[in-house]
Amino acid sequence: MTKVLNKYSRRLTEDKSQGASQAMLYGTGMNDNDMHKPQIGIASVWYEGNTCNMHLNQLAQFVKNSVEKENLKGMRFNTIGVSDGISMGTDGMSYSLQSRDLIADSIETVMSAHWYDGLVSIPGCDKNMPGCMMALGRLNRPGFVIYGGTIQAGVMRGKPIDIVTAFQSYGACLSGQISEQERQETIKKACPGAGACGGMYTANTMACAIEALGMSLPFSSSTPATSVEKVQECDKAGETIKNLLELDIKPRDIMTRKAFENAMVLITVMGGSTNAVLHLLAMASSVDVDLNIDDFQEIANKTPVLADFKPSGKYVMADLHAIGGTPAVMKMLLKAGMLHGDCLTVTGKTLAENLESVADLPEDNTIIHKLDNPIKKTGHLQILKGNVAPEGSVAKITGKEGEVFEGVANVFDSEEEMVAAVEEGKVKKGDVIVIRYEGPKGGPGMPEMLKPTSLIMGAGLGQDVALITDGRFSGGSHGFIVGHIAPEAYEGGMLALLENGDKITIDAINNVINVDLSDQEIAQRKAKWQAPKQKATRGTLKKYIKTVSSASTGCVTDLD
């Protein structure tokens, strides 16, 4: 008996009572034969205004061509996206994190309303990645992700530069390290074309996580956007989705607890973004996998940082592609017993089977350190708790900035206030910069603090100050930084009670973040505190404030 592959779409295409549905489909150009084909949603996060996304419609066409070669019907549709790089440092960043959930909602909506049988998602930028994955998890129909790919490095005066060079150029100009002419040259040459920001920033971090989860094809995360190999990956989409339909392999068969452990190990080895904590928690929630913030610390305790990627290192993802790509790194980790090789993937094979034919990393490569010579012996993503963050916080500690910082609070109620203080020379060595009311509800949208961290680094203060916030950090942020502090200030968390001059200790060895105040002093301040007004009174951000959960649970919007 032939297996039914159009088990969803046939509800519309083969039911005589759905004549209007069929009339509209005939109107799109479908014929009698098409009406019996499985329909595959092709969700492209395309828009022109961002290097990460500008080429995705072209990739979607390649995917559609591949799908239709397999006697399937490809149905392209679009969803929204927000460029973190463009909105960074402005109120527009409030829309970034919530775009993740809007992407998931919109893909779920189109797929469910139109009864598509499978899904190929094509994300390009930071929040695109988990948004597409959350939709796949909720729907639990055969599907996978094709990453839009990484950008090539820019070149200025013979040296490689990237988006973070552009971010840091303003601080460097303020401090006299570069001229205005050099700053202008930097911003014009940092992004040479299509592709996501090139270092181990959030998009590449999440692409690695998705590949380790088994939800993208091998090499997807490290293949550059404009390469022949990215087109070849799209050409495999048809046979891949048809195989998933025939074997009835669904996301929840792949996105298991062990698969999430693989993802956490890989992003740690790669020196990935703090945003991975939020996004993996949200992705796990979409498939009902029990994952919590403390699981990241368990992985960090036994997993080294091996990759020398920007922002704290010197290489970009295209460099890894040239020496074997992400699968070569995973093969090394599998040999060392650090990955679960028996996890199922979208190829229909296990992770170990996918890696059998992959070449080893070159012995003399300088991008990925050997296990006996790590950049940092334990993970860089550290979960800190204490009276400043009872529910937890996420620190990005590579080791280059030290592991303990003691200083005095310099408190700001917004990112803009802090930026002005740096410009006016009011941030000094020994400060623990506190940026509060920038959490999921308070921000709203938990905006990223790349502009402040870039100013700090550009001004030469990276080794001398720390920054803590209930907001997030870009994958491009580095320095002594702690974000995701929960509870957030807007909900009366400890950040709301801090005052200038308070002594704060950040200890990434013992995973503690504390302020030197007695319980009585904290209670007295709490009694005087008044909640601020919501920053959004209408529209999508108003709804986000009402529905978003704490950073410690992934900032999801569909919890009970």
From Swiss-Prot:
It is an enzyme of class 4 (lyase). It catalyses: (2R)-2,3-dihydroxy-3-methylbutanoate = 3-methyl-2-oxobutanoate + H2O; (2R,3R)-2,3-dihydroxy-3-methylpentanoate = (S)-3-methyl-2-oxopentanoate + H2O. Binds 1 [2Fe-2S] cluster per subunit. This cluster acts as a Lewis acid cofactor. Pathway: Amino-acid biosynthesis; L-isoleucine biosynthesis; L-isoleucine from 2-oxobutanoate: step 3/4; Amino-acid biosynthesis; L-valine biosynthesis; L-valine from pyruvate: step 3/4. GO terms for molecular function: 2 iron, 2 sulfur cluster binding; dihydroxy-acid dehydratase activity; magnesium ion binding. Keywords: 2Fe-2S, Amino-acid biosynthesis, Branched-chain amino acid biosynthesis, Iron, Iron-sulfur, Lyase, Magnesium, Metal-binding. Mg(2+) binds at residues 84, 126-127, 448. The modification N6-carboxylysine is found at residue 127. Its EC number is 4.2.1.9. Its cofactor is [2Fe-2S] cluster; Mg(2+). It comes from the Bacteria. The keyword Ligase does not apply. Pfam families: ILV_EDD_C (PF24877), ILVD_EDD_N (PF00920). Belongs to the IlvD/Edd family. Functions in the biosynthesis of branched-chain amino acids. Catalyzes the dehydration of (2R,3R)-2,3-dihydroxy-3-methylpentanoate (2,3-dihydroxy-3-methylvalerate) into 2-oxo-3-methylpentanoate (2-oxo-3-methylvalerate) and of (2R)-2,3-dihydroxy-3-methylbutanoate (2,3-dihydroxyisovalerate) into 2-oxo-3-methylbutanoate (2-oxoisovalerate), the penultimate precursor to L-isoleucine and L-valine, respectively. This is Dihydroxy-acid dehydratase. It comes from Francisella philomiragia subsp. philomiragia (strain ATCC 25017 / CCUG 19701 / FSC 153 / O#319-036).
